Amino acid sequence: TTAGTGSEVTAFSVITDHRRDYKLTVFSYELLPACAILDAELLTSAPASVAAACGIDAFIHAEEAYVSRAASPFSDAMAEKAMELLGGNIRRFVACREDIEAAENMLVGSLFAGIAFSFARLGNVHAMSHPISAYFDVPHGVANAVLLPVIAEYNALADHGRYFKIFNYISPFKVDAGEFEPGLLPGAIRELCGEIGIPNGIVEAVNNASRNGPVSRETIEEKIEAMAADAMKSGNIAVNPRASRQSDIEMLYRRAL
């Protein structure tokens, strides 16, 4: 695997149904391997865009597991170490994939994040990103990344303390608990994404992925109701730290455009 999915240690897989524009998550312990080998040398040929998309996906695995309603002391330990490794190395790794130390830290961080979300599940980011990828063929990690700023700010109202820690894992400018406010999150996340070449918003991400010419904002907006309905079918909605109805999901999509 790349330093992203953590699939080498999870019991989850995703199947894309192109006829229905739908991504289905499959869970089975039969998917767990007997042994997983992490070899950073295999990452050295990864394009920067792949390293960025997969790396931010790994960070979001840890972040969502950390704030999940199903979080536990065990998953917290895995998630915090994952965010430390991933947040501290993603810029360096994307800039130079041949940096073996950074690559190893990304791989181990991705693995810890995979263990964390196997126990604590994910949240609105992953529930909402799958429809974006299914309808518009946006890479999974990119779809997650463009949603994270608005969803993190939305969720932080329900769990201020944990998002304070998340902010310090991704931002080079650390703050004390008394200085932190949820409004700081979107800027810090977008700054990180900008540094590693991730698009800013759904419209830009969709157009970057499009193979058939420009896609208008209006075209994407027309799909929001259907995407929100699909997102609500995800079990991840139930463990998101802040309760969400379909109208909330539609609002978050619009904010993320």
Predicted feature locations:
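A glycine/threonine-rich phosphate-anchoring loop and its flanking beta-alpha core
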Residues: 1-73, 162-165, 169
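Hydrophobic "lid"/C-terminal helical patch
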Residues: 63, 90, 253-256
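Active-site segments that bind and position negatively charged phosphate/pyrophosphate groups
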Residues: 65-188
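C-terminal charged capping/lid subdomain of soluble metabolic enzymes
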Residues: 173-257
